[in-house]
Structures are given as structure tokens and as C-alpha cells.
Amino acid sequence: MATPSDEAVERIKFIEQRLVDPSTVGVFQAEVIKFDMKDSIQEVLKISGEKEILKLPLYNGNQFSGLVTSRAIAKWLQKHIQNNNIELSGTVGELLDFEKKSQYEFIPTSMTIYEAWRLYQTSPKKLDALLLTENGTVEEEIKAVITYDDLLRYIYTHDQYVFN
């Protein structure tokens, strides 16, 4: 009769714990820097560069208007280069014209890490981000902007027993 190693027993216990009480996306809650449609492009680029933010939630007052990605910023910059200079005048709301639509989903804080992971895997659209709110609705305050890389990093560092 085979006796399981201590490592095998530890791994089984870990997997059981993850199945019984899975981690939720609430672990990603952090301060989210939001921008208003009327903010200057120059100021937004400065802040996003300093804070290394690649996904920018945009609001019109208190109403969510969209998510701008670094891809849209690059497209905007390409269209505004003249004589090897880029004029940074304008508002961040103009960036939405360079952004594809529906590249994000709102999700509730109660969603498990693996449900969020599955969303990235099964969504018919290529998601750029999951926007975390208390109940997963657009009307609520965004508590986190979760990328595919964020989930992958979390799973790899916290759930390595599941994948090894």
C-alpha cells in the first residue's frame, strides 16, 4: 500500500481549502484613480505615467463613460503627431473615440478568482479589464480595475499547488 508524501497531503489540503472557501476578487480592492471626461490629456498622461496606470476609468460627472486603454492613447498620439511634435491639448474624453467598445465587464466583489479567470477565458470579446464594484453594476463606485495579468499573477503566487 502506498503512503502519500507530506507534500502530496499538503497539496490535497490546499486544493480542498480552495474548493471549500475560494478567494474572491475582493482581494484586488485598492484606490482607483478615475478621470473626468473634461480633464486635460496632458494631465492624465502625466498621472497615468507616474502611477503606471494602463487602464483609465472615465466619468462624466458621477456617471461612468468608459475605459481608456494604453492602446487608445497610442492611437490618439499617432493621429496628433505633426512635424515630429505632438500637441497634447484637448480633453481625455477625446480618447474614447480611439477606443474599441465593450472591452470590460463589471463584476461583484463576491465573484471568486476562478470565476473571474473563466470570464477572461470564455468571453466572446477580448476583455481588457474587469471593473470591480460591490454588486457588479455600472452605477456603483469602481473598487478595482483587474487585468488578465493581475489574475494570472495572483493565481500563480497564491494557488501554485493547483497548477504544479
Locate predicted features.
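Charged interaction/catalytic cores of defense and host-pathogen modules
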Residues: 1-2
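Tandem CBS (Bateman) regulatory domains
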Residues: 8-31, 69-128, 145-164
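Acidic (E/D-rich), amphipathic helical modules within compact regulatory domains
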Residues: 34-39, 43-84
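A structural micro-motif recognizing beta-strand termini
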Residues: 36-39, 108-112, 135
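Short loop/turn microsegments at loop-to-beta-strand junctions
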Residues: 53-54, 128-132
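Core beta-strand residues in small-molecule sensory/regulatory alpha/beta domains
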Residues: 59, 133-137
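Glycine-rich acetyl-CoA-binding "A-motif" of GNAT/NAT acetyltransferases
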Residues: 64-67, 139-145
